[in-house]
Amino acid sequence: MGASFYNGYSPAERDAKYQVLVERIAIGEQPEAAGPCMLCGDPTSPVMYHDEDYSLPYLWESPALLVLCGNCHKDKLHKRFGRPPSHWYAFIAHVRRGGWASDIAKDAEIRKEVDRYRRALEAGEPFELRPLRPYIGVVGEEWFANLRLDEASKTDPAARPRP
């Protein structure tokens, strides 16, 4: 898999769980990843597994093992470390208004609106995103609500969901 540090887990720890996941899928103990995305809720985008928890014994359900669309997984979740926090917070506000990650990728007006929200957030100014779809999550209780955004959390053992 070629993993890097994440949530206080080493590349070796991450690779080990990934290999077990691949084996579980191959023998039918774990279903292939299927939507909707567990971050943005998009039911139409292709999805993949993402782990937040690599501790032993392995857990194979949410919130340890999640199903995410490619946009959420690669462009939002993992890139939250290399961008100002306002990028992540603007994306989460978009999700909470019923937005999908694919909306930002496909719709220039939505992309501009989220960017305006981000800039307003950075300036400490009010800006309200227009609702897109009903949001079924409980704000503040989602698995992604309190993720660390600091680069140090990648290697900090305290970032682990469990020891």
Task: Write out the residue ranges for each language-model feature.
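Short, 15-30-residue, compositionally biased linear elements
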Residues: 30-42, 84, 95-99
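Short Cys/His-centered divalent metal-binding micro-motifs
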Residues: 65-89
